[in-house]
Amino acid sequence: MAALLAVSGCGDSGPTATEAGKTLKAHITELMKKSHALDVRVTDPGGRDIPCGEGKAKQTFGATAKDAAPQSEPDGLNILLLGALSSVAPYRIVEDRGNAPIRLESDEYKTMIILESPANGQYAVRGETQCLPSS
């Protein structure tokens, strides 16, 4: 029985670009819900493979929204999104220079998200998958 379990785990090479793209979309959509964002608009619907090397591709997704408090500053909105993201999926900060976009990655899901609120009261989130096998 142990040999069967060991062999069955060998074929799992991780998600395809399509699978990771669907996960990315779900994470960003859920993030907007958890942030209680208003007037959410998809800026990049994703869902298509972008070639990035030998039989591999990546996918993207992005959205913008408004905050209930239009005077909320971009850095504060990014921090709010960061807090909400922790209840959506495990991402780690890879770049946060303060008063600038926050870049996060998930090794588990093979995705990257950038929190980049551009102006007072406006959320902006975009992301992409790693370069993964095409589906």
List each model region and its residues:
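Extracytosolic low-complexity repeat regions of secreted or lipid-anchored proteins
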Residues: Q71-S135
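Functionally engaged cysteine thiol sites
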Residues: C10, R48-A57, T111, T129-P133
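Terminal, regulation- and interaction-focused segments at domain boundaries
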Residues: C10-T16, P51-G83
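C-terminal motif of bacterial Sec signal peptides marking the signal peptidase cleavage site
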Residues: L5-G9
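Generic preference for hydrophobic/aromatic residues in regular secondary structure cores
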Residues: V42-T43, K58-D67, L115-E116, V125
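Compositionally biased P/S/T/G-rich terminal and signal peptide-adjacent segments
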Residues: E19-G62
